[in-house]
């Protein structure tokens, strides 16, 4: 039988007492009073911060949004089906943040920056707060470099600059996403990092966009943040801020970024749902009182940084959906007042076959020609004026029976200019091709052609210049100006191609 030695036991106890480390750990906890509809009411959690992350017993994470006298309103970042009344909740002491790194390029992630493309985990050594303060006044400089979208109508008349916020607004099915995705495709080789945020979209639509990017090699420089229609409202509300945090990471590293929020109407609806369930007082259109702040703090994060901070930029293209063309609704007017201009897409133009369906009359860029190269400024001024006069004349001509020759000529020119602005989807043009196209139209070279020949001729002209007059593109890309030499080369090419084209058509 084994003997118990008291001295050995007392020695072990003494050693344990000496090695005892006194540590007091205070955990801020509470209990669930009520849970449902993505909202939980918690009793306790006395020292929780607004916006702090809280963790439920079964692992679900939530954000404390409502701090009331006797309970805390928490929005859940998951379905919360396993949370029970009376289960415990602890405050984490952290505000929502996500990991950030170069490894995110080419990946599809959710609002918590977790990959959802089935290609394994993403390693990141750094993290950023989802809600970061926007750069201050002294940290910015005015927008002066163009961000080419590849769409003639935008680059010529509603130019977008690096660091600008330009709203894309229009009814459903008017090509808003197409304008945004074409802009991403056009950034190939421009050293611009793109972030596409899909909020409350159909999963099939997001898959289509991702496939399009992959086929055209755009995923190499793009990050897709997706929260589909079946995601909890909390995650749909957070997705744009996650996208902005990723874009900021690159902006502060002296890179240029482009971020697309598709679309902010859905984010506002998700926020409205959360606010109403938290019993916050409803305002206009049942949106909460701080819905303006929801979007302003997001869009103010887009900036062109000063030279001291490395001149990085973040250009934002938010998308807002209107109902029956009503731009005076609550969310559209809010976002219009925050952004530096808007591109208005019209259902009538879309149905009339004018695509991209941009209504040039009420679209505007508040940065203007500061975001254009000199060559574009030179040819585009005339285009906008002629199109405005044409729109006025066209409305008047509907009621007039006999028009004089000058008016007929002006109408014919306007129709041809409108034709040259049409572009197929996913076929962006370089700035040199745009300058060439606009010059051909505004200087009357298309007037002798039939309307249905215009686009065919322009496609052939662009190919002809590329192969036979490469010096034209070299001059514009190197000097950024439309020199006399470039003009002479272009005139020569237009005439040579016109002769060939007319002979082909006759044959």
From Swiss-Prot:
Report the EC code(s) recorded for this entry.
Answer: 7.1.2.2
Could you list this entry's UniProt keywords, alphabetically sorted: ATP synthesis, ATP-binding, CF(1), Chloroplast, Hydrogen ion transport, Ion transport, Membrane, Nucleotide-binding, Plastid, Thylakoid, Translocase, Transport
The main location class comes to plastid
| PROSITE patterns xref list | ATPASE_ALPHA_BETA
Gene Ontology CC annotation, any one:
proton-transporting ATP synthase complex
- Which positions are annotated as binding ATP? 170-177
Enzyme's top EC category: translocase
Compartmental location: Plastid, Chloroplast thylakoid membrane
Q: How does it sit in the membrane?
A: Peripheral membrane protein
| Catalytic activities | ATP + H2O + 4 H(+)(in) = ADP + phosphate + 5 H(+)(out)
The site annotation (Required for activity) covers: 363
Q: Name one GO molecular function term.
A: ATP binding
Query: Which GO terms fall under biological process for this protein?
Result: proton motive force-driven ATP synthesis
- Matches recorded under Pfam families: ATP-synt_ab (PF00006), ATP-synt_ab_C (PF00306), ATP-synt_ab_N (PF02874)
Question: What role does it play?
Answer: Produces ATP from ADP in the presence of a proton gradient across the membrane. The alpha chain is a regulatory subunit.
Tell me which family the UniProt entry assigns to this protein: Belongs to the ATPase alpha/beta chains family.
How is this protein organized at the quaternary level? Answer: F-type ATPases have 2 components, CF(1) - the catalytic core - and CF(0) - the membrane proton channel. CF(1) has five subunits: alpha(3), beta(3), gamma(1), delta(1), epsilon(1). CF(0) has four main subunits: a, b, b' and c.
Name the chain's protein. ATP synthase subunit alpha, chloroplastic
Gene of this entry: atpA
């Amino acid at each position: 039988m084994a003997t118990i030695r008291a001295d050995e036991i007392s020695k072990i106890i003494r050693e344990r007492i000496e090695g005892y480390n006194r540590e007091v750990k205070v955990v801020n906890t509470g209990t669930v009073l009520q849970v449902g509809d993505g909202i939980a009411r918690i009793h306790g959690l006395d020292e929780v911060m607004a916006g702090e992350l809280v963790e439920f017993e079964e692992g679900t994470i939530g954000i404390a949004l409502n701090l009331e006298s006797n309970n805390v309103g928490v929005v859940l970042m998951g379905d919360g089906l396993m949370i029970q009344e009376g289960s415990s909740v602890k405050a984490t002491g952290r505000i929502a943040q996500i990991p950030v790194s170069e490894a995110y390029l080419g990946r599809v992630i959710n609002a918590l920056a977790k990959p959802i493309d089935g290609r394994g985990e993403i390693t990141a050594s750094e993290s950023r707060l989802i809600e970061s303060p926007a750069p201050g006044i002294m940290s910015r400089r005015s927008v002066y470099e163009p961000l080419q979208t590849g769409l003639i109508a935008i680059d010529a008349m509603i130019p977008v600059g690096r660091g600008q916020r330009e709203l894309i607004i229009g009814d459903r099915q008017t090509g808003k996403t197409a304008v945004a995705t074409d802009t991403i495709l056009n950034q190939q080789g421009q050293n611009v990092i793109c972030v596409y945020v899909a909020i409350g979209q159909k999963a099939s639509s997001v898959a289509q966009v991702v496939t399009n990017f992959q086929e055209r090699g755009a995923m190499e420089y793009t990050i897709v943040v997706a929260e589909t229609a079946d995601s909890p409202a909390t995650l749909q509300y957070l997705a744009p801020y996650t996208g902005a945090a990723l874009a900021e990471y690159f902006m502060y590293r002296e890179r240029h970024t482009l971020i697309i929020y598709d679309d902010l109407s859905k984010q506002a609806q998700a926020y409205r749902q959360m606010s109403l369930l938290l019993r916050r007082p409803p305002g206009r259109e049942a949106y909460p009182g701080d819905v303006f702040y929801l979007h302003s703090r997001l869009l103010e994060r887009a900036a062109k940084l000063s030279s001291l901070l490395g001149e990085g930029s973040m250009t934002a293209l938010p998308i807002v959906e209107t109902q029956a063309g009503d731009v005076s609704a609550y969310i559209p007017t809010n976002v219009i007042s925050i952004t530096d201009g808007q591109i208005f897409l019209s259902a009538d133009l879309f149905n009339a076959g004018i695509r991209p369906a941009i209504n040039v009359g009420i679209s505007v860029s508040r940065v203007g020609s500061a975001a254009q190269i000199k060559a574009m400024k030179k040819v585009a001024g005339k285009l906008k004026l002629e199109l405005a006069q044409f729109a006025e004349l066209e409305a008047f001509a509907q009621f007039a029976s006999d028009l004089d020759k000058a008016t007929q000529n002006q109408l014919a020119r306007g129709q041809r200019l409108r034709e040259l602005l049409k572009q197929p989807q996913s076929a962006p043009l370089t700035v040199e091709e745009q300058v060439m196209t606009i010059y051909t139209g505004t200087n009357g070279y298309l007037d002798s052609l039939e309307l249905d020949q215009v686009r065919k001729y322009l496609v052939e002209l662009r190919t002809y210049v590329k192969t036979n007059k490469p010096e034209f593109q070299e001059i514009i890309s190197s000097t950024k100006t439309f020199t006399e030499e470039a003009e002479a080369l272009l005139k020569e090419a237009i005439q040579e191609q016109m002769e060939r084209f007319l002979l082909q058509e006759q044959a």
